UniProtKB/Swiss-Prot annotation:
Name the record gives this protein: Metallothionein
Sequence positions that bind a divalent metal cation 1: 4, 6, 20, 23
Family: Belongs to the metallothionein superfamily. Type 1 family.
Function recorded in the entry: Metallothioneins have a high content of cysteine residues that bind various heavy metals.
Region entry Alpha, spans: 29-60
UniProt entry keywords in alphabetical sequence: Metal-binding, Metal-thiolate cluster
Region ranges (Beta): 1-28
Gene Ontology MF terms: metal ion binding
Entry annotated with the keyword Cell wall biogenesis/degradation: no
Keyword Cell wall biogenesis/degradation among record annotations: no
Chain sites annotated for binding a divalent metal cation 3: 14, 18, 23, 28
InterPro entries named in the record: Metalthion_dom_sf, Metalthion_dom_sf_vert, Metalthion_vert, Metalthion_vert_metal_BS
Pfam families named among the record's database cross-references: Metallothio
Length: 60
């Protein structure tokens, strides 16, 4: 069971211990959710994701 309600609320502000596996949120901590593609250097830990593509608009 996903400990976070990312897919329900659209937001995820989890701590480092969170293990979201089905996150479809638009604003979340990269350290918790996989909003951005794995290996995306522009989405550093703690960054707030804005999309699912690895580009300049990926995070804010």
């Amino acid at each position: 069971m996903d400990p976070c309600e990312c897919s329900k609320t659209g937001t995820c502000n989890c701590g480092g211990s969170c293990t979201c596996t089905n996150c479809s949120c638009t604003t979340c901590k990269k350290s918790c959710c996989s909003c951005c593609p794995s290996g995306c250097t522009k989405c550093a830990s703690g960054c707030v994701c804005k999309g699912k593509t690895c580009d300049t608009s990926c995070c804010q």
